[in-house]
C-alpha cells in the first residue's frame, strides 16, 4: 500500500514475493541527467549491494545521456568474480526528496532492479519483516539528536 501513513511523513510498500521468502521493495521516480522523467519503478532493497541503483541493460539505456567516462566505471568483487559496472548520473525522487544518484548496469550480463547501500544510507528506512512492509520515514530535523 504505497503512501501508507503519508500524513505522518511515512511512505510504505509491501514486500514482494520471493522464491523462499518475501523481500523488501522501495519505489523511486527516476530522471536522467537531462531531467527527462523515466517514471516510477519498484526496486528490490539489497543491503549486500554496495552501489547505488542497478538496472537491467535495456532500462539503463535511458540514462546513458549522463554516462560517465569508462575510467570512472566501478568494479565490484562478488563471491565468484569481479563485475565491471557502467555508471550514469541521474536523479531519484523518493518521499518528496530529490537525490543525485548513479545508475549502474553490468558491462557484461543482464543486471537487476536493485537499490543498494549508496542510496539506502541517505534515507531513513524501516524494514518491518513481520508485517512485510518497507517504509521511508520523514527526514530528521537538522540539529536533532536521536540519542
Predicted regions and their residues:
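Pepsin/retropepsin-fold aspartyl endopeptidases
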Residues: 1-147
Amino acid at each position: 500500500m504505497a503512501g501508507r501513513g503519508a500524513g505522518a511523513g511515512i511512505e510504505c510498500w509491501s514486500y514482494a514475493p520471493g522464491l523462499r521468502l518475501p523481500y523488501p521493495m522501495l519505489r523511486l521516480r527516476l530522471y536522467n541527467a537531462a531531467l527527462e522523467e523515466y517514471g516510477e519503478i519498484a526496486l528490490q532493497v539489497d543491503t549486500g549491494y554496495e552501489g547505488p541503483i542497478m538496472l537491467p541493460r535495456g532500462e539503463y539505456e535511458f540514462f546513458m545521456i549522463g554516462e560517465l567516462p569508462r575510467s570512472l566505471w566501478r568494479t565490484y568483487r562478488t563471491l565468484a568474480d569481479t563485475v565491471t559496472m557502467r555508471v550514469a548520473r541521474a536523479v531519484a525522487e523518493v518521499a518528496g526528496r530529490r537525490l543525485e544518484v548513479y545508475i549502474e548496469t553490468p558491462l557484461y550480463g543482464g543486471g537487476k532492479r536493485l537499490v543498494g547501500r549508496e542510496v539506502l544510507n541517505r534515507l531513513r528506512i524501516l524494514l518491518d519483516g513481520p508485517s512485510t512492509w518497507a517504509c521511508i520515514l520523514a527526514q530528521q530535523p537538522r540539529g536533532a539528536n536521536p540519542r
